[in-house]
């Protein structure tokens, strides 16, 4: 990334123009052409820009951003907004959801900001028109002590509610989940939640983790509040009917079952299906096993672009790993991993072990360095062409990389809580929670005037930016869209496994915990794999077209 900033700076010096500080820095033919939604933290305006950084649309609110914002299929904007509180003061303060139509008119709002619960950071729009809302839930020092907490003070555990919007304001809560219903502790044997946390990985150790309060936008501060988990992301997988919830303070993310009633979610059925990032949080590891460091934005790749290894996008997660307290030093990475998803929707866990995988499928950069580091907020989004759009949130730096890590598009958020940033001035307050790019054929743009306006920044420099439109079908860059015709056998296999395919494919053989054992790209119709050196047992064969447009996972048995 440094080389592009230096190149841009040098070009401006050569042309006699003052240095560029915000807006578009780089756009190349290798970037995925689309429209990027940018909602600066604390600002009241949200922009949709093209790849040249020019405004396509904008929405104004009376309320400052409460972090997340999304463009829905009908062209409406769903955003979070800030509401003050006398109880909750943590970073990522929200409290209000707003939905504006394409023309900027407020269609609907919902407020969750009282003395017992307060929305923060994120929400997830569901295909049925419901919305999942993440919130802090207040628990008094007395309640914390009664649950076995040894420290004094209140706790704000996470809760999730599902709301059906009604009219122009409000809605009906039809489902809810509370972390408080899923606690375990080994300090007081007289309490009903007594047990060994390592024997109950689906529950939260009530004595794990410190609390925080206050802090700047998007990150926890220090103080005497009860921000215990500091969850900062929630996402929904409609096919699996599962929810992912992210905890910055615990350095792990969780997957919950949504195929439950509220009553069931309060019991064993509401325990965690899966957790990953920090096995020490559930007594199955130490600090040396930790792999996530104050991370943000874990989400499935189902509705985005191809996976890096051609695996099953329903079992592949992308996460921005911020890197605070990383042993090698503060540095961020964007990490991709394959979850040990089983056919029944559960996740494999060996007795006494931590949840897999033990290794990543892909990580950018390969070697973390301080020049790429955001201590809070941030996110990443896989593009249909296999690139990844990264939001290095603290400085409002957005950039797109190829699978090999080459930067092909760069932009610095040109708007802040103080308004448009003047070109040439140092941007202050332009931190950006996340950024999302939408393809030109996204349904939100059907029938819309997509003519570009001016750049977002004030006093923009003269520039000659060219767009590089992609083909209409952006799902696989013109590759055949029919599914793979695949046969393999024998199954069970002993020494040789044969694969036949009508398209070039990439295959990956994984153990049942999701660890990659071997992989290859094959272009011939017939292919043979030597499995004679593998121990007998069950394995997963992940097969995908060359660019990941179609994929499937198969169970393979190997006999001695």
Regions found by a protein language model. Name each.
Residues 20-474:
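Histidine-/acidic-rich catalytic cores in large beta-rich domains
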Residues 4-13:
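Sec-dependent N-terminal signal peptides
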Residues 15-19:
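Sec/Tat signal peptide C-region and signal peptidase I cleavage site
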Residues 50-51, 480-560:
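C-terminal outer-membrane/trafficking sorting elements
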Residues 8, 474, 505:
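Short, surface-exposed linear motifs at loops/turns and structural transition points
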